[in-house]
């Protein structure tokens, strides 16, 4: 009896531990899955920008769309400033989701800063900047590249303009930083991609015919989607499955050719990249420019006064 009780106790303990692990897995892992898209690039590429200047997000998001960037022309050392990435798209647009249903578009962005520039810590943010970046999870591309920032996917309804709080370097403390003009590169996408990192196509694509022939039947599936039955010139029938949510461009009785599009393009999103320049300005240079400006103004005033004095002297001599 004691042995049976001990066995039952062990079984209950194993069951409890297993259940606890499952719950922890759901709590810890599931939220990260929604942020998996930038991780695709982080895991596959050491740098998000290729030698050609192309940002790697374009490998999965094939359609080209605009993206805008706003940043100050110049900043002082050890200063927090904001860079705004704008990802415009039609507010009425709906994308096809993985299960074939329609939903709102998600957005994501990557900002490639000069070395030394990085995400500003929370304790350096102003109240206004904290409000602008609330509920935004911006992270470095990698532990070694804190000058490259990524975010997404996040809902595009309220995030078509994403504010990145940036901290500029101080050349007095960072010997790698210099007072210079630097480029800033940015990439932004809206909607799902067409290619997974594995190379497989998503359902956000045009489906091409796998064979030529006549469509003799289009079968509607219970869970959505279609099976197209095609008979070729040799009277051999083949079938092709179309994922749920796609809109067919063909009908029964149509004759199709190899690689012909069978559905309308479901993609309403796309990726774009842009760039701007920023100057890390020396405070001493600004002070020098201010001194030079006031010196120039004083010199002009002095010149005008001397000219008027000279004219008075000339006028007095002419009166004699």
From Swiss-Prot:
Q: Which GO terms describe its biological process?
A: photosynthesis
Looking up SUPFAM superfamilies in the UniProt record yields: Cytochrome f subunit of the cytochrome b6f complex, transmembrane anchor, Cytochrome f, large domain, Rudiment single hybrid motif
Q: What cofactor does this one take?
A: heme
Q: Where in the cell is it found?
A: Plastid, Chloroplast thylakoid membrane
Q: Does the keyword Ligase apply?
A: no
Name where it mostly resides: plastid
Q: InterPro entries from the entry?
A: Cyt-f_TM, Cyt_f, Cyt_f_lg_dom, Cyt_f_lg_dom_sf, Rudment_hybrid_motif
Q: Which UniProt keywords apply?
A: Chloroplast, Electron transport, Heme, Iron, Membrane, Metal-binding, Photosynthesis, Plastid, Signal, Thylakoid, Transmembrane, Transmembrane helix, Transport
Query: What topology in the membrane does the UniProt record assign?
Result: Single-pass membrane protein
The cofactor remark states: Binds 1 heme group covalently.
Asked whether the UniProt record includes Plastid among its keywords, one would answer: yes
The Gene Ontology CC terms held by the record are: chloroplast thylakoid membrane
Query: Signal peptide position in this chain?
Result: 1-35
Q: Which residues cross the membrane?
A: 286-306
One GO MF term attached to the UniProt entry: iron ion binding
Enumerate the residues binding heme.
37, 57, 60-61
Q: To which protein family does this belong?
A: Belongs to the cytochrome f family.
Q: What does this protein do?
A: Component of the cytochrome b6-f complex, which mediates electron transfer between photosystem II (PSII) and photosystem I (PSI), cyclic electron flow around PSI, and state transitions.
Report the PANTHER family cross-referenced here. CYTOCHROME F (PTHR33288:SF10), PTHR33288
Q: How does it assemble?
A: The 4 large subunits of the cytochrome b6-f complex are cytochrome b6, subunit IV (17 kDa polypeptide, petD), cytochrome f and the Rieske protein, while the 4 small subunits are PetG, PetL, PetM and PetN. The complex functions as a dimer.
Name this protein carries in UniProt: Cytochrome f
The opening ranks of the lineage are: Eukaryota, Rhodophyta, Bangiophyceae, Bangiales, Bangiaceae
Q: What is the gene name? A: petA
């Amino acid at each position: 009896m004691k042995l049976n009780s001990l066995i039952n106790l062990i079984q209950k303990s194993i069951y409890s531990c297993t259940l606890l692990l499952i719950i922890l897995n759901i709590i810890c892992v599931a939220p990260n899955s929604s942020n998996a898209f930038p991780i695709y690039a982080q895991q596959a590429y050491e740098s998000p920008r290729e030698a050609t200047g192309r940002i790697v997000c374009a490998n999965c998001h094939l359609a080209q769309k605009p993206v805008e960037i706003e940043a100050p022309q110049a900043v002082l050392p050890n200063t927090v400033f904001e860079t705004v990435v704008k990802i415009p798209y039609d507010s009425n647009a709906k994308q096809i989701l993985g299960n074939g249903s329609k939903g709102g578009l998600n957005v994501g962005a990557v900002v490639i800063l000069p070395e030394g520039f990085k995400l500003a810590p929370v304790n350096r943010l102003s109240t206004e900047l904290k409000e602008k970046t609330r509920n935004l999870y911006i992270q470095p591309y990698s532990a070694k590249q804190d000058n490259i920032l990524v975010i997404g996917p996040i809902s595009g309804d309220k995030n078509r303009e994403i504010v990145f709080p940036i901290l500029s370097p101080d050349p007095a403390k960072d010997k790698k930083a210099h007072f210079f003009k630097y480029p800033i590169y940015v990439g932004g996408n809206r909607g799902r991609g067409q290619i997974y990192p594995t190379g497989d196509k998503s359902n956000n694509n045009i489906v091409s015919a796998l064979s030529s022939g006549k469509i003799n039947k289009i079968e509607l599936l219970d869970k959505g989607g279609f099976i197209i039955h095609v008979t070729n010139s040799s009277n051999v029938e083949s079938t092709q499955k179309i994922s749920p949510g796609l809109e067919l461009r063909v009908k029964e009785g149509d004759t199709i050719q190899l690689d012909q599009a069978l559905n309308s393009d479901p993609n309403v999103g796309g990726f774009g990249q842009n760039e701007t320049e920023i100057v890390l300005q020396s405070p001493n240079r600004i002070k020098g420019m201010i001194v030079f400006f006031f010196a120039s103004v004083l010199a002009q005033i002095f010149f005008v006064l001397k000219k008027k004095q000279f004219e008075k002297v000339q006028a007095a001599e002419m009166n004699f």
